Amino acid sequence: MHIPDGYLDLSIAGLFYILSIAVLGYSIYRLRGQKLTSLFGIVAAAIFAAQMLNWPIPGGTSAHFVGGALAGILLGPYAGALAMAVVLTIQCLVFADGGITALGANVWNMAIVNVFVGYYVYRAIERFNRSAAAFIAGWIGITLAAIFAGIEIGISTSFGYGLKVTLPVMGTWHALLGLVEGTITAGVVSYIAAARPDVIEQKAAPGKLALAVIAAMIAVSPLFAYAAELVGYSEPLENAAAMLGLEENPIYEGLLPDYTLPGLDPYAGTLIAGIVGTVIVLALGFALTRYARTA
């Protein structure tokens, strides 16, 4: 769902930069003085690691967990939006995952729409069944985020195809992929609620187990990259663009483009890139936590 450079008109890209900055700025304002736990940084790092696990899907595409609804459920909408924004910004600036001109739109879709919709859907129906609420929140959150992406691309003349193409492609694919997103969200929320209910209540942060899970996801990420490469995978948006004969026009190549290191074995490079990205996300997460406590 990461929109690359060249897909959005500059006016559309600029509009969503403004909207995203406004919402994130308000989120920072709402969090000032709050006692955020280290859960903020850990959730951000876990989502970054989970997004590196692209699993291939028959037909030449792939999918990965996005985690916006999960971030909202565990952190609340304001902290959840900031955590996702940290992940997306690092993905863009360090790994060129998503275009720099489209960063505002990507933040809007995955860090704002996905998080806020997921959070409020979950809260609205949580009292009936926690697991079902988390599943529905994950499914609706990612589907609406994809629909927004389809609208942004479809109204941009740069892409060359209108809403009749972009909305069905983005909406249908992600409504199906949302079933996996919802299942993972429900599984994680249910497990944490049973094992560490204080984490769900945001009164504590997960301990060494959470860090071990993050490390495990990073460790196996090269295997996922290898498996996906065998079937020639691409993400749904990239796959659709290829079928339409469109090409990306990257403006910024990133420090470690495509999660690799120049001159290094691609799978070792993926592992190192994952470690670097996780450390950066953790550091920024803890820095924002400290700022919120002292501001």
From Swiss-Prot:
Listed Gene3D superfamilies: 1.10.1760.20
Transmembrane segments: 8-28, 39-59, 70-90, 98-118, 135-155, 175-195, 211-231, 268-288
Keyword hit for S-adenosyl-L-methionine: no
Chief location category: membrane
Transcription among keywords: no
InterPro entries hit by this protein: CbiM/NikMN (IPR002751), PDGLE_dom (IPR025937)
Keywords carried by this UniProt record: Cell membrane, Ion transport, Membrane, Nickel, Nickel transport, Transmembrane, Transmembrane helix, Transport
Subcellular localization, as worded in the UniProt entry: Cell membrane
Gene Ontology biological process terms, A to Z: nickel cation transport
Pfam families: CbiM, PDGLE
Cellular component terms per the entry's GO annotation: plasma membrane
Stated family: Belongs to the CbiM family. NikM subfamily.
Descriptive protein name: Putative fused nickel transport protein NikMN
Source organism of this protein record: Archaeoglobus fulgidus (strain ATCC 49558 / DSM 4304 / JCM 9628 / NBRC 100126 / VC-16)
